[in-house]
Amino acid sequence: MKKRWLCMFMASAVAASMLTGCGGSSKSEATNGEVNVFVWTEYVPESVFDAFEEETGIKVNVSTYSSNEDMLSKVKSESEGTYDIVLPSDYMIELMIAQDMLEELDKEALTNLSNINDVYLDPSYDPGNVYTVPYQGGVAAIAVNTSKVDKELTSYDDLFDPDLAGQLVVLDDYRAVIGMTARSMGYSMNETDPAVLSEIEEKLLTLKNNIALFDSDSPKSAMISGDCSVGMIWSAEIALSMEENPDIEVVYPEEGPYVFMDNWAILKGSKNYDNAMTFINYMLEPDTAVKVSEEFPYLCPNKAAVEQMGTDYSENIAKNPPAEVIASGEYVENLDNDTLEIYNEMWTKLKE
């Protein structure tokens, strides 16, 4: 879930016609034609698309987005069949299922599904993985440039310290930043009580003076360059920044972090269902997952790939957040329209 900044309200449920056969012809691997993939920016290596095309003969047409809401809006604004595959996060999947926007997956075509760690299967947002399979996940952690920050940071709450004025890069993601504020106060990231949200807003706005930059696309850049000394950014971005600047460290907040999992899904009305299934199954191959993790080192749910990567991945806590960190965290959930309106107003006030 890489970038999720634009707050939109849940649209009314839309009816989409079922794709005839619902994958009934997908039992054999497709080997020609094309597939239209709509994914996060800086999240799937070009080399993976190239290798898939070479191996299968299927041309991959790639479009990108910077937030779940951006993706949802674009899919709804385009004609049905414009995109075959999307890569939504946990909470967005729940919404898209409710709006009948996703095609059921042909499990017989997913011969590589057994490579996924059982811990990441059968999620609450898609019981039985009827519509989705995991790609990558991670947490919103704290990046600290120890050469510029003298004090120890251990929590989301520490980010509100006035001494950090003008030093923060934070995700351009309303659910992440508001959720982080809620967690720092002992509340849920999915808080709906207007009275509690008023308390959260009051604290949220005190963060404004500390924020130098909102960036979800490449927040590591500000950390690597030294323009920002502290960040509330995705764990993989911290891992990449640590490779460039040895003074940068990762801190997992003691309150428990924002946790996410992004998942492959096929849109209703897909014109290339068989090719889409072939692509998703390819992404579940261990070698493919290794290539992905080498370039974008997020939490890898592919157990076979993790075994191949060895200690460089498994013992790097920025690339591979410890199990206890994940267990202490919280996933974002869908919220009702009235609550989303409050969140939107809070976000607008923070950024104005």
For every predicted segment, state its role.
Residues 45, 66-68, 82-227:
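Extracytoplasmic ligand-binding site segments that recognize negatively charged/polar headgroups
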Residues 323-352:
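Conserved C-terminal helix/tail region of periplasmic/extracytoplasmic solute-binding proteins
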Residues 93-95, 230-247:
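A ligand-binding cleft/hinge motif common to bilobed small-molecule-binding domains
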Residues 28-95:
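Early extracytoplasmic/lumenal segment of secretory-pathway proteins
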